Amino acid sequence: MKAVCVLSGGLDSAVCMAMAKSEGLELYSITFDYGQRAVKKEIIASKKLSELFGAVHKVVELPFVKDFSSSALTKKEEEVPTIKNSELDNLEKATETMEKVWVPARNMILFSISSGFAEFVDAKYIYTGLNVEEGATFPDNTEEFLNRFNSVLEYGTLNKVKMKSPLYKYSKKEIVKIGKKLEEKLNVEFLKYSYSCYHDNKTDFLHCGTCESCMRRKRAFKEAGVEDPTEYIL
């Protein structure tokens, strides 16, 4: 049975892909270039992860997305927001930073294209790494969004491909724990090849350590009691 993994190269999508691999599925992966700052590093990470899990990897360029986005992820003149560790669970602050990196209808666009790719390769499932931590502020990272999108797929695809997000109830800490167990089960070290940073840093897999995504990654490994293999600038 085939599955397509929506792969940003980040921690969540990497663990999600490992889960699909552990289920014995034939894997395809799809990564999107929509003009985001870290796209080069995301593609490098996604290619490496795809190699590790034996997935057929495809990169899709979507240059038009940045043309109607004022997000700090796609506009270099906009400053990427930072957040203190003590503010990560502050809903008001997290919502404020979310709005600065929000790309209009991003998941709607990416998931729609992933659905077309899945139908083309006759995949039964699409795996994506939605999680409860990001779902607290990003409306397109929620269980409700997932369920409603699946309802659309029943009418929008002939093979009625279904989107799965096995991590949507888990926090980043729990995702790290799941990832570590999967490394042991699959005998593949993959967590160190994931890339979470919002920035395009000088070397592959080097993280800034100060953007919100890096801060959540740091905290997740620390709280999970798992050694963090990530190299941070700060």
Curated annotation (Swiss-Prot):
Span of the signal peptide: none
Residues reported in the UniProt entry to bind ATP: 7-17
Catalysed conversion reaction: 7-carboxy-7-deazaguanine + NH4(+) + ATP = 7-cyano-7-deazaguanine + ADP + phosphate + H2O + H(+)
UniProt name for this protein: 7-cyano-7-deazaguanine synthase
Listed GO MF terms: ATP binding; ligase activity, forming carbon-nitrogen bonds; zinc ion binding
Cofactor: Zn(2+)
EC number: 6.3.4.20
Function: Catalyzes the ATP-dependent conversion of 7-carboxy-7-deazaguanine (CDG) to 7-cyano-7-deazaguanine (preQ(0)).
Family, per entry: Belongs to the QueC family.
Cofactor binding, note field: Binds 1 zinc ion per subunit.
Listed transmembrane segments: none
Organism for this UniProt entry: Methanococcus aeolicus (strain ATCC BAA-1280 / DSM 17508 / OCM 812 / Nankai-3)
PANTHER family named among the record's database cross-references: 7-CYANO-7-DEAZAGUANINE SYNTHASE (PTHR42914:SF1)
EC class: ligase
Residue positions binding Zn(2+): 197, 208, 211, 214
Keywords in alphabetical order: ATP-binding, Ligase, Metal-binding, Nucleotide-binding, Zinc
InterPro entries membership: QueC, Rossmann-like_a/b/a_fold
Gene3D superfamilies attached to this UniProt entry: HUPs
Pathway noted in the entry: Purine metabolism; 7-cyano-7-deazaguanine biosynthesis
Protein's UniProt keywords contain Ligase: yes
Pfam family, one: QueC
Domain of life (superkingdom): Archaea
CDD domains: QueC-like (cd01995)
SUPFAM superfamilies for this protein: Adenine nucleotide alpha hydrolases-like
Keyword Glycoprotein listed: no
